[in-house]
Amino acid sequence: MPFLSINLVFERLNMEKYDIVMVFPAMGKTVVSEEDSRFVDCDTFKYHYRIPNKLSHLPIDKLKGADSLIPINHWEDTFIESLEHCSGVPLVNTNILIYNKLVELGKRVLVVLPLKKDFDLVMQRIRDRGGIDYDDSWVSWFENLYSEFGRANVIEYIGANELSERLKGWKDYGYL
């Protein structure tokens, strides 16, 4: 049965070969990259911020949202350049600026967003791991991100817990 559903997804999307997969936050890209070496979790965090020495001992999930991080100007170009040297299929968090630059460069980007019914579940995961407080401004930022990507060229809406299975299937069938 999973074989049939994967083929239907390919047919519906008229899938071609994609260079990069952009995934909505908290859908499991880190887990997938840890399970399967064909995928690389390309986190923008280390390109986007300079970490002060006093925080350098903390793991990345504890650093996100820290007040003393130092933003890096024009980090996007360095990040995009780093994708060229990836040893697998790059999995990137959704970012409309990065998406537009990649498309401009001729990269084929598949955008993966949660189904509307799973949006609240994904938001709860982000809150649970300390990524955001339950604050209207953060929630609306993610809702805006969701709607911005609703206009992407190739988009796939999947359940919040389906990323691993879908990515592996797409890779096995030659679409990534």
Residue positions per predicted region:
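Small-molecule kinase domains that catalyze NTP-dependent phosphoryl transfer to phosphate-bearing small molecules
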Residues: 128-176
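Glycine-rich phosphate-binding P-loop
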Residues: 18-36
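Short, Lys/Arg-enriched N-terminal segments with co-localized hydrophobic residues
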Residues: 2-14
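Structural recognition of the conserved hydrophobic beta-strand(s) that form the central parallel beta-sheet
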Residues: 88-94
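Short, charged, surface-exposed secondary-structure boundary motifs
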Residues: 49-55, 118-127, 167
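Conserved phosphate-donor/acceptor-positioning beta-strand/loop module used by diverse small-molecule
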Residues: 93, 105-125
